[in-house]
Amino acid sequence: MTISVAVSGASGYAGGEVLRLLAGHPDVTIGAITAHSNAGSRLGELQPHLHGLASRILEDTTVENLSGHDVVFLALPHGASADIAAQLPEGTVVIDAGADHRLEDPAAWEKFYGSAHAGTWPYGLPELPGQREKLKGANRIAVPGCYPTSALLALTPGFAGSLLQPDDVVIVAASGTSGAGKAAKVNLIGSEVMGSMSPYGVGGGHRHTPEIEQGLGNAAGEAVTVSFTPTLAPMSRGILTTATAKVKPGVTAAELRSAWEEAYDDEPFVHLLPEGQWPSTKSVQGSNHAVMQVAFDAHTGRVIVTCAIDNLTKGTAGGAVQSMNIALGLAETAGLNLQGVAP
């Protein structure tokens, strides 16, 4: 079975990463490649690393150009996907890498994004409890945010196992600059970023906060309160998340580790490292893998989980392709058998 796929937003980092993965997918033929502001340009001018697709000409992002494909990936700015998605045929599998369809609560969407809620689609993080079944046969899929991907992978086993308290969760995550997109910004130029780290969205203002609370709350079966602080790190790609939560009385270090082992032992892309080994962003660069370590701080009664992912791969495009594979009944790992890059 050969699947025809269209990719919108192909001039950006997320769209380019989707194309990189699809170019190596055994079951996919790449059809329309669109980028509204760069229509008419050669893809190779904007994504010079995509050698096999370099001669392709970018088309305008219209419903007409995207229709007629089995799958459409939307790698568009937040708020831009909903209108296009609503006009695509119901039988088309539409995978939205933007935020438009992630949140279940319309009030949370309106508070953090400032527009009308477009509805909720199945959430494309297969490793969450019960999520694979929801993705099978789905024709609309919301790709998680990059920070929520790492945060939810880090803490979901503890909340799903009723081991953690819901009211004191603290998450600090460092991301590479590609997470801020490709548009030129003064704070992202080399002389500002090199040798420096800086927080942003501090004090509960980051848009991924409600998404993290939603996912952890679904796992816990009750509301979870999260303090989330993102940090910009001097690297092009990668996320290193440190997530902590108070454990419930009587929970032991052995119980914690057992919960994470049980959650991820059979997962092809999520790996709990041997005790004493800690995650690094370099070890997952360019891959769809997530690596993590869990520890118990007996002094404070907190679990500490560190998780490393590539924000563009597992955090965006890899998760999108993985979800597509599940939705279409393909091998879940198809097109994703990539190891990290070293040194």
From Swiss-Prot:
Active site: 146
Keyword Cell membrane: no
HAMAP family: ArgC_type1
GO biological process: L-arginine biosynthetic process
Known pathway: Amino-acid biosynthesis; L-arginine biosynthesis; N(2)-acetyl-L-ornithine from L-glutamate: step 3/4
Family, as annotated: Belongs to the NAGSA dehydrogenase family. Type 1 subfamily.
Protein name listed in UniProt: N-acetyl-gamma-glutamyl-phosphate reductase
Function: Catalyzes the NADPH-dependent reduction of N-acetyl-5-glutamyl phosphate to yield N-acetyl-L-glutamate 5-semialdehyde.
The encoding gene: argC
GO cellular component entries: cytoplasm
Catalytic activity: N-acetyl-L-glutamate 5-semialdehyde + phosphate + NADP(+) = N-acetyl-L-glutamyl 5-phosphate + NADPH + H(+)
CDD domains according to UniProt: AGPR_1_actinobacAGPR_like (cd24148), AGPR_1_C (cd23934)
Enzyme Commission (EC) number: 1.2.1.38
Gene3D superfamilies in the record: Dihydrodipicolinate Reductase, domain 2, NAD(P)-binding Rossmann-like Domain
Pfam family membership, one: Semialdhyde_dhC_1
Domain of life of the source: Bacteria
MF terms in GO: N-acetyl-gamma-glutamyl-phosphate reductase activity; NAD binding; NADP+ binding
Keyword tags: Amino-acid biosynthesis, Arginine biosynthesis, Cytoplasm, NADP, Oxidoreductase
Compartment(s) of residence: Cytoplasm
